[in-house]
A protein has these predicted regions:
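Compositionally biased intrinsically disordered regions enriched in Thr/Gly
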Residues: 20-236
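N-terminal secretory signal peptides that target proteins for export/translocation
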Residues: 1-2
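Bacterial N-terminal signal peptides
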Residues: 5-16
Length: 236
């Protein structure tokens, strides 16, 4: 007697031993972008930021941009060009790096603010979000042994920047900017190559050198990255 295979049996035969892929955490990681434009005789605001596919990270980014705009407007609310003949400006632009399977999404916001002086101030703001729970991957969450990790990261960044800055190298500035303390390395993202650390103008070199970034490959940080994060990154 022959039995008609059930649908489940057919699927098992077709799939064989192939591993089942987990469903993506959310897709696409960026749903849309928000643009804020305001112009008065004394001010220009031109801000953009992403809306991610989870509500928690989107609120964090939105609140940061809103507070930055609020603080910018407080600098000189009555500015009308009568004393200083140039408008004040605030600009933000963003970039997003999802990891291959979407577990982690990194966001970098470039902020430029001009409120007088010889040139604008520029600085990076970064976040790494775990799309499994919407939480932020802080430096402490990335590196359980923060002291050992900062010592390693500091030494590697010093080596790279000492070579790449060339004529812009100012040893005292570099020494201060890469000291193994949390504030010097809190602006980072996760990429396919490793952990990228961003340094604002003046942190490690003169303003003319611009923003600096050092990407440290994951294998150079072996044993220092939190096991659950390292496992997820390796799996991707």
């Amino acid at each position: 007697m022959y039995r008609i295979p059930t649908l489940l049996t057919v699927l098992i035969l077709l799939l064989g031993a192939s591993p089942l892929r987990a469903a993506p955490f959310c897709d696409p990681p960026v749903l849309t972008a928000v643009a804020i434009e305001e112009r008065t005789p004394g001010f220009t605001v031109d801000a953009e930021y992403p809306v991610l596919c989870r509500a928690e990270p989107s609120r964090v980014i939105r609140d940061f941009v809103s507070n930055t705009i609020f603080d910018f407007k407080k600098v000189d609310p009555g500015h009308d060009l009568s004393v200083f003949p140039h408008p004040y400006e605030l600009l933000t632009r963003y970039a997003v790096w999802p990891t291959a399977e979407g577990r982690f999404v990194s966001v970098k916001l470039h902020v430029m603010a001009y409120t007088g002086g010889a040139h604008p101030n520029n600085w990076p703001m970064t976040w790494v979000f775990d799309m499994a729970d919407g939480g932020e991957i802080t430096l402490n969450r990335l590196f359980p042994d923060r002291e050992a990790a900062l010592d390693r990261v500091s030494a590697l960044c010093r080596k790279v920047l000492s070579a790449s800055l060339g004529g812009m190298l100012v040893p005292d500035m570099l020494d201060a900017g890469v000291r193994p303390v949390e504030d010097n390395f809190k602006r980072f993202i996760l990429t396919g190559e490793g952990v990228a650390f961003f340094f604002a103008p003046y942190q490690v070199a003169p303003y003319a050198a611009g923003e600096q970034v050092v990407t440290i490959p994951f294998d150079h940080l072996g044993g220092l990255i939190a096991p659950n994060i390292a496992a997820a990154v390796r799996a991707e």
